[in-house]
Amino acid sequence: MSAWVLPDHIADVLPSEARHIEELRRSLLDTARCYGYELVMPPLLEHLESLLTGAGAALDLQTFKLVDQLSGRMMGLRADSTPQVARIDAHLLNRPGVTRLCYCGPVLHTRPGAPHASREPLQFGAEIYGHAGLEADLEILMLALDCLKVVKVASPSVDLADARIVHALLKGVPVEIALAEQIYAALAAKDASELAVLTKKFPSSSRQGLLALVQLYGDEKVLLEAEKALQPLPAITESLSNLKWLASQLDGAKVSFDLADLRGYAYYTGTRFSIYAAGASDALVRGGRYDEVGAVFGRNRPAAGFSLDVKALVGVLPARPLRAAIRAPWREAADLRVAIASLRAQGETVVCVLPGHESEVDEFRCDRELVPRNGQWIVASI
């Protein structure tokens, strides 16, 4: 095999796309900062037990593992940043009130999340700790929508769900972890026949409720149908009320509901959302509430957040126009160097053409050039 061939679903990012990704990263972090979110940078490599805390088998399977040559302990390359940020909130910051944190960095997956997905996403996310009320859920959802608006994602649509509905239906039913994961997969796939087989020994009320979830997706009428089809358990009633309130606060956004949506990692404990947009084969953003994610670090407090892949975001945005640049000759003349430095100080891109070469760039369009005229260097159109 040729030395330049990369592993499957791993790719180099070339100049024009790399610049686009960097500009999106800056815009997303600046938007989060406007909401009061502080930037943190957790390490790419960490002890395995810290990375996989409370996250379930899905994250375990997605994590690359290796042995630390210094300590002999198992380590992992992060597949998701949320457990790390929870550790920072619980153990390092340990603040008494609300904490707002954001991050942006690479994660690594053993398998791609979708047929054409990268195994090295650039994950951006924001998380709010310390408030159990719906105000935090709404803030994180509005921040996610504003992030997409800032980078000019057209007409995003929000899909709402709540993990507590399924948890309430399964409460009191002896379900092993493997069976629970099969049930979650059948619900996500809307596979009623498989779900019927998996739940055939369940109590009738739980079984009928789970089977009803397969059909409970669509517009706001779904919530009314759910009130009739599901048991009037307190957790279910509260979840449906919360979803209705959240939807009512999203003025102008297209909102739908999918009460069987359990995709993502196992740490979600309450309301959850996915945001879709034209041109994307999967959700651009996933988020929700995960109140127990920091428990293993000694601080079990409310938390909500979201994440997205900046690389995937680039794929649904129109191609950027090339940046206008100025072409300049390479000479030892001091006045030329002064002219070039002055233009760069003004924010202009000046590309020096080295002797014997033409300038070849993917990211810039040289529409002007620096030429000598009457003893001065001036910018002229090409």
Curated annotation (Swiss-Prot):
Q: In its UniProt record, which GO terms are filed under biological process?
A: histidyl-tRNA aminoacylation; L-histidine biosynthetic process
Q: Which InterPro entries match?
A: aa-tRNA-synth_II/BPL/LPL, HisRS-like_core, HisRS/HisZ, HisZ
Q: Give the matching PANTHER family.
A: HISTIDINE--TRNA LIGASE, MITOCHONDRIAL-RELATED, HISTIDYL-TRNA SYNTHETASE
**GO molecular function (one):** histidine-tRNA ligase activity
Q: What is this protein called?
A: ATP phosphoribosyltransferase regulatory subunit
Lineage, top-rank taxon, reads Bacteria
- Organism encoding this protein: Albidiferax ferrireducens (strain ATCC BAA-621 / DSM 15236 / T118) (Rhodoferax ferrireducens)
Tell me yes or no: is Amino-acid biosynthesis among this UniProt entry's keywords.
yes
Compartments annotated for it: namely: Cytoplasm
Q: What else is known?
A: This function is generally fulfilled by the C-terminal part of HisG, which is missing in some bacteria such as this one.
Q: Which GO terms describe its cellular component?
A: cytoplasm
Where mainly located?
A: cytoplasm
The protein's assembly and partners: Heteromultimer composed of HisG and HisZ subunits.
This chain is encoded by the gene named hisZ
Q: In which pathway does it act?
A: Amino-acid biosynthesis; L-histidine biosynthesis; L-histidine from 5-phospho-alpha-D-ribose 1-diphosphate: step 1/9
